[in-house]
Amino acid sequence: MKTYLPESTILGILKLIEVYEFYDQPCLFSCQNLSGQAYIALWVDSSEVEDVWLYAPVSLERFDNIKNGKVDLKTVFTHSEDAFVFEVSIPCDDHKQAIVKALACKDLTEDQLPETNQFIQNKILI
């Protein structure tokens, strides 16, 4: 299993769009499900047991604004258009299911978030 794209969850069948940061695997990327919902995903934690990600649903207009440097990454998560993001815990054990839960933007902690004024600059080809 790819440790950054959960399978069989309420997020749907996800396909990678672009990678913006990479460290052993994509750390910051965009993806989209088959019905067209786009997400900006950020790797926030890792352990021997699981990797934890934040997935912010974004409209296509907002996605363009993010890619064009009009919205910083912290704002993507703290002011999601629907006021929530998904926390996705993906187990390292391929036999276990990913756990997805909705989090209100106001409940995110600073250690889960990018620093202020960080923007997507370029996509990385992998």
Each predicted region: which residue ranges?
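Cysteine-dependent deubiquitinase/ubiquitin-like isopeptidase catalytic cores across multiple families
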Residues: 4-11, 15, 116
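Low-complexity intrinsically disordered segments
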Residues: 54-126
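Short, surface-exposed terminal/edge motifs of secreted or surface/virion proteins that either
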Residues: 37-64
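Amphipathic, interaction-prone secondary-structure segments
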Residues: 10-46
